[in-house]
Amino acid sequence: MTVQTTKTDLNKTLRVKKDYLEKNRKRYKVDATGKTLWRLAASIAIKLTGKDKAWYNDFWDAGDYVIVENADKIATTGKKMTQKIYYRYSGYKGNLKSMTLAEKLQKNPTDVLWYAIRGMLPKNKLRDPRMKRVKLIVGTTTKYDNFKPISL
């Protein structure tokens, strides 16, 4: 989409129709092997929100789809595998459960990256629709190759 502006309308908000946003969503494919967890999550969150686009507005859902392969082979820096702790609490007394990052990666490898991405998105009504556009895969797959994803 090319937008022509003149000196008089530089202060006006660029309006893009919802149909255009939905039809022109790109698909990105990321191989998570050896990549740092939080840096990878931050770059995925930028693609999901659409902050890399010229017509970004925080109240529009202008983001793209992201497919992450080898989500179980992410890396972390320092001693985070043993010192980073995830907590769950059901609300009952004495029912606080804790799990380290290494334990969580063994139990469900995609949860770690999913929660990291979710934590980096804005806490509003658009977070759940944006999270539906993330596909986390353990290993590799050719299931999404018909969309011709762009590799990051």
Which residues are covered by each model-predicted region?
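Ribosome large-subunit tunnel/peptidyl-transferase-proximal elements
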Residues: 2-115, 125, 147-152
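Hydrophobic, well-ordered secondary-structure segments
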Residues: 113-114, 118, 131
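Charged phosphate-binding loop/patch that engages nucleotide di/tri-phosphates or the phosphate backbone
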Residues: 127, 131-152
